[in-house]
């Protein structure tokens, strides 16, 4: 066997390229594609699942052609489960209690620092009151 140090100058690539020929005497065949390997071993598909999978497998098929009864029935069930909210009944209940839903009820914004401090400050002269009013209500 040839030493590894002799293969470093590009000889290693040559050995790797010739390796399939040395093993069989013929080059390797192309490997089968992923779908052809997987599809024969997959289990049969039920009618309900087939109605959903058909548009994905055959996108060129128009939506209104053929047997769309199962698909429309499934769509109807899915729409019933949603309820009136955005995400479905359970999530909408969580959203309304946590305030994270589609239309959360937001409390009034917190008062500014001036509005919290001023009522507790000492009485103010007329000149200062005018300045404070301008700060509280600009514009």
Curated annotation (Swiss-Prot):
Keyword Secreted: yes
GO cellular component: extracellular region
Disulfide bridges in this chain: 86-102
MF terms (GO), sorted A to Z: hormone activity; toxin activity
Subcellular location: Secreted
Residues spanning the signal sequence: 1-25
Pfam family, one: ANP
PROSITE patterns documented for this protein: NATRIURETIC_PEPTIDE (PS00263)
Tissue specificity comment: Expressed by the venom gland.
Propeptide feature: residues: 26-75, 117-139
One of the GO biological process terms: vasodilation
Record's keyword terms, sorted: Disulfide bond, Hypotensive agent, Secreted, Signal, Toxin, Vasoactive, Vasodilator
UniProt KW Nucleotidyltransferase keyword: no
InterPro entries in alphabetical order: C_natriurtcpep (IPR002406), Natr_peptide (IPR000663), Natr_peptide_CS (IPR030480)
Family: Belongs to the natriuretic peptide family.
Function description: Natriuretic peptide that dose-dependently induces the rapid relaxation of rat aortic strips phenylephrine-precontracted. Acts by stimulating cGMP production in a dose-dependent manner (by probably activating NPR1 and/or NPR2). May also show potent hypotensive effects.
Record's protein name: Natriuretic peptide Mf-NP
Species assigned in the record: Micrurus fulvius (Eastern coral snake)
């Amino acid at each position: 066997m040839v030493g590894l140090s002799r293969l470093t100058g590009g000889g290693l690539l040559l050995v790797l390229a010739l390796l399939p020929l040395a093993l069989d005497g013929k080059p390797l065949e192309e490997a089968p594609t992923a779908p052809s390997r997987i599809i024969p071993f997959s289990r049969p598909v039920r009618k309900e699942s087939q109605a959903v999978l058909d548009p994905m497998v055959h996108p060129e098929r128009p939506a209104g052609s053929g047997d769309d009864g199962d698909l429309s029935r499934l769509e109807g069930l899915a729409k019933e489960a949603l309820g009136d909210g955005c995400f479905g009944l359970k999530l909408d209940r969580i959203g309304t209690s946590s305030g994270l839903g589609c239309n959360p009820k937001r409390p009034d914004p917190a008062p500014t620092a001036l509005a919290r401090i001023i009522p507790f400050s000492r009485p103010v002269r007329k000149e200062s009151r005018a300045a404070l009013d301008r700060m509280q209500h600009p514009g």
